[in-house]
Amino acid sequence: MCASVKYNIRGPALIPRMKTKHRIYYITLFSIVLLGLIATGMFQFWPHSIESSGDWSVEKRTGRDVPLVRLPADSPVPERGDLSCRMHTCFDVYRCGFNPKNKIKVYIYPLKKYVGEAGVPVSSTISREYNELLTAISDSDYYTDDVTRACLFVPSIDLLNQNSLRVKETAQALAQLSRWDRGTNHLLFNMLPGGPPDYNTALDVPRDRALLAGGGFSTWTYRQGYDVSIPVYSPLSAEVDLPEKGPGPRRYFLLSSQVALHPEYREDLAALQARHGEAVLVLDKCSNLSEGVPAARRRCHQQQAFDYPQVLQEATFCMVLRGARLGQAVLSDVLRAGCVPVIIADSYVLPFSEVLDWKRASVVVPEEKMSDVYSILQSIPRRQIEEMQRQARWFWEAYFQSIKAIALATLQIINDRIYPYAAISYEDWNDPPAVKWGSVSNPLFLPLIPPQSQGFTAIVLTYDRVESLFRVITEVSKVPSLSKLLVVWNNQNKNPPEDSLWPKIRVPLKVVRTAENKLSNRFFPYDEIETEAVLAIDDDIIMLTSDELQFGYEVWREFPDRLVGYPGRLHLWDHEMNKWKYESEWTNEVSMVLTGAAFYHKYFNYLYTYKMPGDIKNWVDAHMNCEDIAMNFLVANVTGKAVIKVTPRKKFKCPECTAIDGLSLDQTHMVERSECINKFASVFGTMPLKVVEHRADPVLYKDDFPEKLKSFPNIGSL
């Protein structure tokens, strides 16, 4: 009891001290947390250091903001450009890594001001053009601000014009870059290389293994497949409003607008003008211009002044001659005007020649043939000239009109080298949008790997055999690679079954009702076909297993320009009748696979519907026969290749079908098959079908191997 009283007496004296200590502790802890939050917020909103990789733009910087880097006189200098460099020897593709979007990542170094030991700047202030170039890259899908993810590195050192550089000190600045590593995976942009008196055709700054996107390369300095030849940008053609002029003959047949040309060229041009009179116009700089008129905007012939570059639109052909440098900005002006450039500059590597087909937009004439240039140009057909005029204008719009266009085209070329299976096609580089929108991609120019949109679309042509149709749908739906099933309902007198009656399958099923009962309806390029691969299958082909169909699709992926199918047939020459004969009996050879069950590229639907020679398509529809033979002729004629028969199965007769169910069971129908071959051979003017003696089977087919370990165990019987 006494102890209890004693405790109660002392208790009240201890409790306030404990509360005070705890209060001080929590206040201190709260203060620390609050200060931490304030500091974090200030860090987030306070201007970051210049080392922030994304903050390089000169528009965001003043001279005080840019860190100064002083280069000692004995700073290391990179080796001269290695002329032996190629992508497989000097480029580290492993830095690019796996990228599901097949896009390289480009890192731009933070902006810094480099000065020599005496404090003299290495180069002039960053130019507007180079700032636009870096901005274009940073705004593109290629850009990354994470240096560890970068595949390509671009310095913020302006190298566009060598005249504004101190060559040695610039090289020393490059060597100071944190990821330089002898220039590996570094991209340098230069449009005006060399300097007096030699004017070399490549940047004189030592750069070791760095890639060079240069204007004015010669074949002696250009590392094919490594460097990128780019245009010399013309601000004049980019800034002047020059409405497009339609193709066709113009006032002058040939025009020269360059100033400060070599005297020998001037003599040749004068001789051309004297020989051909007003058809040739030779311009030079103007000597007596009114005050305030920019000299760059005028050209003169004798005492007559012309607005430049507007005068270029008055000529059919415009000459582009070598000057002190091989690359000339006049090429951009000429393309903008829709004038066909006549390039007379031996060894000049044309801009983006790795991907652009300059034969479609220009005429290249050797310097020694300059006196014959007029007769050479006269030999070009008028229609070809008009096409070249359109192509010239398109090249300017797509690749020359801005620094951004030049930068992105350069990165796309490098991207295509690193991810060749996803490279842009020849047509995409060279065809104007109007041409591309009106055409279909040719399957003969497919990527090196199958498209990412895996799978195939099964097209079932049917009339009224609903029961067997449903069985076909059920069996085909078991194939793992099936993407969509399209039923072509060819019966105009009967409606398809109600939606609730159709088999429930895992992929979309679409029914298309046709306006007329035509066999060619199965080969129409329906919008619903979204995959590259198409499986044409009849509504009575109920015997094929899912393994057989999946294996057939895998074979097609290896040979996407072939007809890959199951029922094999042969054409033979009948010596007694002196004509072709259709053979359906089992033989050692095959020249056709019937499209009652066959894979092919969807492009051939387009060709069958719109490009089938002669009256074959109408003949097929009128006779209700031979659409499959017509497709075999078409594919063989386009590709020059044989069909591929897959799996050993030879019997494709529907066991439940009666004699009146199928067209192919009619004797007259079989006789017409031979007539079809002769008819089609006559229309094509040749026999395109190729005879082969092999078929494709799974690797372990008939091997004494556990079935469960085979990829395609259920290939079926004959």
Swiss-Prot record:
Glycans are attached at N288, N637. The keyword Metal-binding applies. It catalyses: 3-O-{[(1->4)-beta-D-GlcA-(1->4)-alpha-D-GlcNAc](n)-(1->4)-beta-D-GlcA-(1->3)-beta-D-Gal-(1->3)-beta-D-Gal-(1->4)-beta-D-Xyl}-L-seryl-[protein] + UDP-N-acetyl-alpha-D-glucosamine = 3-O-{alpha-D-GlcNAc-[(1->4)-beta-D-GlcA-(1->4)-alpha-D-GlcNAc](n)-(1->4)-beta-D-GlcA-(1->3)-beta-D-Gal-(1->3)-beta-D-Gal-(1->4)-beta-D-Xyl}-L-seryl-[protein] + UDP + H(+). Disulfide bonds join C85-C90, C96-C151, C286-C300, C318-C339, C626-C676. Mn(2+) binds at D540. GO terms for molecular function: acetylglucosaminyltransferase activity; glucuronosyl-N-acetylglucosaminyl-proteoglycan 4-alpha-N-acetylglucosaminyltransferase activity; glucuronosyltransferase activity; metal ion binding; N-acetylglucosaminyl-proteoglycan 4-beta-glucuronosyltransferase activity. UDP binds at L461, R465, N490, N517, D538, D539. UDP-N-acetyl-alpha-D-glucosamine binds at R465, N490, N517, R522, D538, D539, D540, E627, D628, R673. Its main location: Golgi. It is an enzyme of class 2 (transferase). Pathway: Protein modification; protein glycosylation. A protein binds at Y582, S584, K651, K653. Keywords: Disulfide bond, Endoplasmic reticulum, Glycoprotein, Glycosyltransferase, Golgi apparatus, Manganese, Membrane, Metal-binding, Secreted, Signal-anchor, Transferase, Transmembrane, Transmembrane helix. The chain crosses the membrane at residues 26-46. A soluble form is generated by proteolytic processing. Residues 1-25 are cytoplasmic. Its cofactor is Mn(2+). It is found in: Golgi apparatus membrane; Golgi apparatus, cis-Golgi network membrane; Endoplasmic reticulum membrane; Secreted. Pfam families: Exostosin_GT47, Glyco_transf_64. It comes from the Eukaryota. Belongs to the glycosyltransferase 47 family. Part of the heparan sulfate polymerase, a dimeric complex composed of EXT1 and EXT2. Could also form homooligomeric complexes. Interacts with NDST1. Interacts with GALNT5. This is Exostosin-2. The gene is EXT2.
